[in-house]
Regions:
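C-terminal transmembrane helical hairpin of 12-TM major facilitator-type secondary transporters
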Residues: 271-312
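Juxtamembrane intracellular "pre-TM" segments in multi-pass secondary transporters
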Residues: 1, 180-214
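Helix-loop junctions on the cytosolic side of multi-pass membrane transporters
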Residues: 165-191, 383-389
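Cytoplasmic helix-loop-helix junction between adjacent transmembrane helices
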Residues: 98-140
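Helix-to-loop junctions at the C-terminal end of transmembrane segments
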Residues: 52-65, 154, 256-269, 354
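A membrane-interface helix-boundary motif in multi-pass transporters
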Residues: 152-167, 241-243, 352-375
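Helix-loop boundary and gating motifs at the non-cytosolic
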Residues: 1-52, 205-249, 339
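C-terminal ends and interior cores of transmembrane alpha-helices
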Residues: 75-89, 279-292
């Protein structure tokens, strides 16, 4: 079985459980008595835990095993799902978020490093961007199907959206254990500290990698959309209607990855396209924040997701082109540690801004508008100073 196909299978299974929570995640938290501001604060803690866990988990992935790192991610994800099944308020939800955050840190860097080196062993380095883009397309359709099924589950008991995660995470663990040992490990093995020193040295000398990390920090403003879209659209379409809203939104995500897959530019030369994708996310959020009714904001958030769908595979291709095998996972974690700072700062600022405001669509629209402006200003500025090679 080709490495790319193994990667697609693993990624689809690993994403399916979380996908079933997306449409009802915020309604579930609201049912626990949390406010919109507290949801943002919870999200800030999630990203803080994930970011602080990035570097040690990435070093272990290179020094110990990338397959081991992926399996540990599955274990923490399963425990996080169990914790959410029994969550009763903010503190218990926080424990669940922290478990999931550590799990996501084990995945981060190790996934991209595994498939990049597995492709190299097969002599398929030239397919790297296409593989990342295809994985995004598959992920898009998995998220659409999972979101629809999650809406059906939420109609009977919103808490049960976490139950599938308890089963899909062990299934993903099994795929890694049976199919992903060996071929995705580093070509040249380094110790954890050697991988860390090499990663820091590369970042110090590479203007292009420093540029993309700053762009990732700016991109963190998209987190304002993640947990507010369902409270925004639920009064307009109902709980079940969120499933088709989610489908329309995420189909835009998947189609954008198809566009990335067809790009003919050389690998590693994606800087202008990365900036363009962030501009699209900003235009989408600003437009959604200024719109009213259903169709105008829906069209705007589809554009927003189109930009997000382009961003991830473009960044993966841009970075992996510049990083050597022995420390891919460690550098990926260092990149996430720095680049995801925006994902921590943004929800904290949102909480500080709206914690005394009502849980209304107008509050959400204001947040989207401001975050969209940040995305536009940041992306356009960085486009002007983008690396040319």
């Amino acid at each position: 079985m080709r490495a790319a196909h193994i990667y697609y299978l693993y990624d689809a299974i690993a994403d399916f459980g979380p996908a079933m929570t997306v449409t009802a995640y915020s309604p579930f938290l609201l049912s626990l008595g949390l406010t919109l501001g507290e949801i943002s604060l919870l999200n800030a803690f999630f990203w803080l835990v994930a970011v602080l866990s990035e570097l040690p988990t990435g070093m272990l992935a290179d020094g110990k095993s990338r397959a081991w790192s992926l399996k540990m991610g599955c274990v923490f994800l399963a425990f996080g799902g169990c914790a959410y099944l029994f969550a009763q308020g903010f503190l218990s939800a926080l424990i669940a978020e922290c478990l999931v955050g550590v799990g996501m840190a084990f995945f981060s860097g190790a996934e991209q490093a595994w498939v990049t080196d597995a492709l190299h062993r097969e002599g398929r380095d030239h397919e790297r961007r296409q593989v990342f883009a295809t994985a995004s397309v598959i992920r898009g359709f998995v998220m659409v199907i999972g979101g629809f099924l999650g809406s059906l589950i939420a109609l009977s008991c919103v808490r049960l959206i976490w139950l599938p995660l308890v089963f899909t995470a062990p299934l993903a663990w099994l795929v890694v254990h049976k199919l992903m040992n060996g071929q995705g490990e580093p070509i040249h093995k380094l110790t954890e500290m050697e991988a860390l020193r090499a990663s820091i040295s590369l970042l110090k000398t590479s203007r292009a990698l420093a540029w993309v990390i700053v762009m990732m920090i700016v991109f963190g403003a998209v987190v304002s959309f993640n947990h507010f879209w369902s409270p925004y659209f639920q009064p307009l379409v109902g709980t079940m209607g969120l499933s088709w809203v989610w489908a329309l939104i995420y189909i835009g995500f998947a189609l954008s990855a198809v566009l990335v897959r067809r790009l003919s530019i050389p690998q590693g030369q994606e800087a202008a396209w990365i900036a363009a994708s962030v501009v699209m996310t900003g235009v989408g959020l600003v437009s959604a924040g200024m719109s009213s009714g259903l169709m105008l904001p829906l069209s705007a958030v589809i554009l927003h997701e189109f930009g997000r769908g382009m961003f991830y595979p473009l960044v993966d291709s841009f970075v992996q082109h510049r990083v050597e095998s022995g420390y891919r996972a460690t550098f990926g974690s260092l990149q996430s540690l720095l680049g995801r700072i925006g994902l921590v700062i943004t929800p904290v600022l949102i909480w500080l801004t709206i914690h005394e405001k009502p849980n209304t669509p107008s509050t959400i629209g204001f947040v989207w508008f401001v975050c969209g402006i940040v995305l536009l200003i940041g992306a356009l500025t960085l486009f002007l100073v983008r690396p040319r090679k």
